[in-house]
Amino acid sequence: MHVQVRTLLSAPFRLMIASGLVLGVAVGVTAQPRDQNGAGNAQDDAAILRQGQEVTAKVCSTCHELDDIYKKRKTLREWDETVADMATRGAEATPGQFALVKRYLTRTWGSLPVNTATPEEFRAVLGLTEKEAAVIVEYRKAHGPFADRAALSRVEGLDQAKLDAQLDALVFAK
């Protein structure tokens, strides 16, 4: 039987820990191995996602059922807040493990507001390269909001398979 011991920390100290965690998570998400075109190695990405799944199961299952995670997709910011909240509530993990949990959840269970998303959000949720993410944002600036997936397919230079793999993540609200 696993017994989790929690220490009651002052509110300012918990806030400091959560702030540090959010910064560490942000660095962990953006500091991905890339080549000169902003492309990540697909094998490295797959390995990171496998490791993320394992760490997520370990860290999250000590407090709740894993099914609780998958009730609602969340944006990059919402996963930031969720993981920071987990840390302040006593979830046991290193900052690197929290960053990996957040990266995994954002990538596999993220929600992407296509018409307002930043390049960072496109990369985090869909696994796009920096170049692909920038092309989408520039196209959106030049042509206006995307009505649906078909409109997004008009953007040249995208790996359409990456978009199709995460159709449920795409939100086209106006």
Report each predicted region and the residues it spans.
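Alpha-helical interaction/regulatory segments in DNA maintenance proteins
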Residues: A99-T108, G157-K174
